[in-house]
């Protein structure tokens, strides 16, 4: 499963493995709602997308979980019981073609654990 390899690479902080699972023309789009730091424009290419994802996953105290995101496999990043990011993925073959990254705290409430 592509998303599981993506999650494992993120969890290890392995930029080489992370880049290998991203398609050459991968696009990453963030929704920060202007409430938290995040890129305003879509990111294009393995290097830009890998840099953002690596930054998110390296935050202190963040745990990763592979979960269903909009009916597809994705990642939920939590600090304790609170979701800090949800990453939806669209795959093409054995690579990730598109990532949708929700950082907007107003949209993460349903992902918190009680």
Features from the language model and the residues they span:
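C-terminal and inter-domain tail/linker signature
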Residues: 1-114
């Amino acid at each position: 499963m592509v998303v599981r390899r993506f999650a494992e690479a993120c969890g290890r902080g392995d930029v080489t493995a992370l880049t290998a699972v991203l398609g050459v023309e991968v696009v990453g789009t963030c929704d920060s709602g202007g409430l938290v730091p995040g890129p305003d424009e879509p990111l294009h290419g393995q290097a830009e997308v890998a840099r953002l994802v690596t930054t998110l996953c390296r935050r202190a105290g963040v745990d990763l979980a592979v979960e269903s995101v909009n009916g597809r496999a994705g990642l939920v990043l939590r600090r304790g019981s609170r979701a800090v990011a949800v990453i939806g993925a669209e795959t093409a073959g054995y690579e990730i073609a598109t990532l949708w990254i929700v950082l907007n705290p107003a949209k993460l409430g349903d992902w918190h654990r009680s």
